[in-house]
Structure formats: structure tokens, C-alpha cells
């Protein structure tokens, strides 16, 4: 069985009772979303037209009351059914937490929310892509995610320490506006060649190693400050100017 759980609170403002999300589901597998108010929605995995590539399927809900806590449960009887989860329409409600520990085959994770959510992906070893903004963790360690290629945790103001020492495959990193982040550990074999750390004040030692890593990987792109300076700079070295950002 695969399961993702979210605890939310609807809010007393315009659209404060609405939520939406996208799922990438294995072809023909069914996934149920129990919205927590007695309503259940079922989605089925499908491919994009004229392609073998899996398509995102949409799900959404409007709650009957504002200012009420609800538990959303996304689940399938098949352990490998849920491949991607993007909570892209959760910004109108307050997120209390997002629980991913029972979805071991998750490869793609996105979340745009507001609230108190902390990120725990220690039980998701197949993750390749994470875009999870404004997490409330003080420390994050992605040692359990060796396949991770792209990570964005922009706006995570509570974050102090980020451990990527086991993430050899990581190529893109977004830590924009992580104001308190100072400690960044990278793998000695890191393939990192694109980073955005504007308005993030890494300590000089870690910033120096970051720059060495980027230069070692030849073609690289960086946007950020220099040694804690808020001045934003953009550097492209050896990159094709037509490359899609």
C-alpha cells in the first residue's frame, strides 16, 4: 500500500476552503483521495497522448466549512502506484504537516503551501526531484535520497544546516531566501552545476567549497551573493545561452 497524508486547516478568507493537487500515477492504477469530510475522489493513472510518458492527473476539492481541521489521505493498494505528488494548490489553506513515510516509491515531490510543514523524506529512497518551499526544518539531511538530481527549498527561513554529502547525482540546487542557512555539506563527487543562493548567507568555508565544486564541473550557472553579501550576482560559465532555464 502507498499513502500520503496531509493535515490542513481551512481559512476564513476568499477561497480559504479550496485545495488542489496533481498526481503522477502508474498507468491504469487507481488512487483514492479521501478529503477528510466524507468525500472521496478516485483518479486513474494515464499516459500523455501519443506517448509512453506518464501524465499528471488533477484532483481538487472545496470544503463545506472554514476554520476547520481536515486530514487528507491519498492512497492506493499498490505500493508502487504513486510516482509523483505535487501539492500545487494548497496555498489557500494552512498546512499543518505532510506525511510521506508510507510512499516509498515516490520519485517526484512538489509542494507550495503555507503553514508549519516539515519535510521528512527519509523513507523515500527513489526521489529524484524535490520542490518543497518554505519548510520549517532547522536541519535537513538528504542522505537517504541518493538518486536526487534536483532540489528546491526556497524561502525556508528556519533552515540552518543542509546535508547533501551523499547526493552525488545532484545537479540543480535552489536555496533562494534561506536567510539563516549557513552550513552546506556537498558530496566530494557532486555533479552540481546550477545553484541559486541569492539572499542566503552561507559561511565562507562552505561558500568556498561550493564555488570549487561548480568550477570543477566545468559548465555551471550560479545566482547568489558573495561571502554573505546581499548583492546578487549571476554567473554563467561555459553554458549554452539558449539552454532552457
Where on the chain are the PLM-derived regions?
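A short local loop/turn or secondary-structure capping micro-motif enriched for an aromatic residue
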Residues: 49-52, 129, 170, 192-194
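Canonical leucine-rich repeat
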Residues: 96-98, 109, 119-121, 130, ...
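Canonical position 11/12 of the leucine-rich repeat
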Residues: 91-96, 115-117, 136-138, 147, ...
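Conserved hydrophobic beta-strand positions in leucine-rich repeat
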Residues: 83-85, 107-111, 128-132, 149-153, ...
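Leucine-rich repeat
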Residues: 103, 124-126, 135, 145-147, ...
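N-terminal capping/linker segments that flank leucine-rich repeat
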Residues: 1-115, 123-125, 146, 188-190, ...
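Functionally constrained cores in energy, signaling, and assembly domains
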Residues: 111, 115-116, 126, 130, ...
Amino acid at each position: 500500500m502507498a499513502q500520503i497524508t496531509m493535515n490542513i486547516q481551512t481559512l476564513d478568507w476568499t477561497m480559504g476552503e479550496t485545495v488542489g493537487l496533481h498526481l503522477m500515477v502508474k498507468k491504469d492504477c487507481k488512487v483514492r483521495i479521501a478529503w477528510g469530510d466524507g468525500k472521496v475522489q478516485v483518479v486513474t493513472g494515464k499516459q500523455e497522448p501519443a506517448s509512453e510518458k506518464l501524465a499528471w492527473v488533477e484532483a481538487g476539492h472545496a470544503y463545506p466549512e472554514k476554520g476547520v481541521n481536515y486530514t487528507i489521505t491519498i492512497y492506493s493498494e499498490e505500493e508502487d502506484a504513486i510516482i509523483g505528488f505535487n501539492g500545487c494548490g494548497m496555498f489557500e489553506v494552512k498546512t499543518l504537516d505532510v506525511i510521506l513515510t508510507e510512499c516509498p516509491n515516490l520519485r517526484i515531490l512538489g509542494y507550495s503551501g503555507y503553514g508549519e510543514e516539515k519535510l521528512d523524506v527519509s523513507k523515500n529512497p527513489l526521489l529524484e526531484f524535490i520542490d518543497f518551499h518554505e519548510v520549517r526544518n532547522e536541519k535537513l539531511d538528504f542522505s537517504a535520497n541518493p538518486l536526487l538530481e534536483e532540489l528546491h527549498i526556497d524561502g525556508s527561513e528556519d533552515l540552518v544546516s543542509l546535508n547533501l554529502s551523499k547526493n552525488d547525482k545532484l545537479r540543480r540546487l535552489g536555496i533562494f531566501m534561506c536567510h539563516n542557512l549557513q552550513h552546506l555539506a556537498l558530496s566530494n563527487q557532486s555533479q552540481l552545476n546550477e545553484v541559486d543562493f541569492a539572499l542566503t548567507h552561507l559561511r565562507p568555508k562552505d561558500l568556498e567549497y561550493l564555488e570549487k565544486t561548480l568550477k570543477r564541473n566545468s559548465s555551471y550557472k550560479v545566482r547568489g551573493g558573495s561571502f554573505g553579501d546581499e548583492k546578487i550576482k549571476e554567473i554563467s560559465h561555459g553554458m549554452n545561452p539558449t539552454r532552457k532555464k
